[in-house]
Swiss-Prot record:
Residue ranges, compositional bias (Acidic residues): 297-315
Record organism: Daucus carota
Pfam families: Tubulin, Tubulin_C
Protein name: Tubulin beta-1 chain
Originating gene: TUBB1
Region Disordered: start-end pairs: 295-315
């Protein structure tokens, strides 16, 4: 199942997560993929965005298998900076999102590809079940009117794809480390070139990858490029820097919740303050988990394992 919803407004966050939990009850063994639009740091539509987002993340951590994080502000930035659009409309933002969605799901829709289903993708990208919030990127970035005419080389595509300015959520991957990542190229190309490129990227930026997950960048090839482009690539990264986003929402949440601002809207509909406290602590746990794995080193991992073994023997 794929669900597209926003976490700022009432319908996307409330109805969206309710739908997800009902589907989860009904079809517990099916994969649940969400494309979630998080509230932006500067552009705010409603006052209670932090509440809605925190309550939604609380649900998404439990009920979604894979969550692609999108962000209106990051999309606006891409439109301004990269596409040089002066007044981007929602149509332009949707164009970027649809390109990414098409890239993420291309291995499901076209026959004979590696990573041919969501489950396989999830296995590759999720080292710990709670940490399933991914940043997505797309290259080459084009506006709706001008599909690019020059074709890019594989190294250029790769470079554009890993560029932090291309990420569709407001977190900078350079502030954290990648646990895992996946790159999907859409063109007839040799996998050997591709793997070389990926190894290159990893060697150059080795400090941005955790060393305790070897071979953590997977690449796949799909022969059929998207309409109007000769080649394209989609990037999905599980980076610890996404905690910036959760931390920001959490701070806004705490600032409002401490004063119990606007709470009556929720309690009037039959919600309990306890649910808010729970959602807040779940979000904070998520942030600290990301931080823990960002700081973890290979030696520490071995140390933990030794401790666990000793405990097991002690029992």
């Amino acid at each position: 199942f794929q669900v597209c919803h926003s976490l700022g407004g009432g319908t996307g966050s409330g109805m969206g997560t309710l739908l997800i939990s009902k589907i989860r009850e009904e079809y517990p063994d099916r994969m649940m993929l969400t494309f979630s639009v998080f509230p932006s740091p500067k552009v705010s539509d409603t006052v209670v965005e932090p509440y809605n987002a925190t309550l939604s993340v609380h649900q998404l951590v439990e009920n979604a298998d894979v969550c692609m994080v999108l962000d209106n502000e990051a999309l606006y930035d891409i439109c301004f900076r990269t596409l040089k659009l002066t007044t981007p409309s929602f149509g332009d933002l949707n164009h970027l999102i649809s390109a990414t969605m098409s890239g993420v799901t291309c291995s499901l829709r076209f026959p004979g590809q590696l990573n041919s289903d969501l489950r396989k993708l999830a296995v590759i990208l999720i080292p710990f079940p709670r940490l399933h919030f991914f940043m997505v990127g797309f290259a080459p970035l084009t506006s709706r009117g001008s599909q690019q005419y020059r074709s890019l080389s594989v190294p250029e595509l790769t470079q554009q794809m890993w560029d932090s300015k291309n990420m569709m959520c407001a977190a900078d991957p350079r502030h954290g480390r990648y646990l895992t990542a996946s790159a999907m190229f859409r063109e007839k190309m040799s996998t050997k070139d591709l793997d070389e490129q990926m190894i290159n990227v990893q060697n150059k930026n080795s400090s941005y990858f955790v060393e305790w997950i070897p071979n953590n960048v997977k690449s796949t090839v799909c022969d059929i490029p998207p309409t109007g482009l000769k080649m394209a690539s989609t990037f999905i990264g599980n980076s610890t820097s996404i905690q910036e986003m959760f931390r920001r929402v959490s701070e806004q949440f705490t600032a409002m919740f401490r004063r119990k601002a606007f709470l009556h809207w929720y309690t009037g509909e039959g919600m309990d303050e306890m649910e808010f406290t729970e959602a807040e602590s779940n979000m904070n746990d998520l942030v600290s988990e990301y931080q823990q794995y960002q700081d973890a080193t290979a030696d520490e991992e071995e140390y933990y394992e030794d401790e666990e073994e000793e405990e097991a023997q002690g029992m």
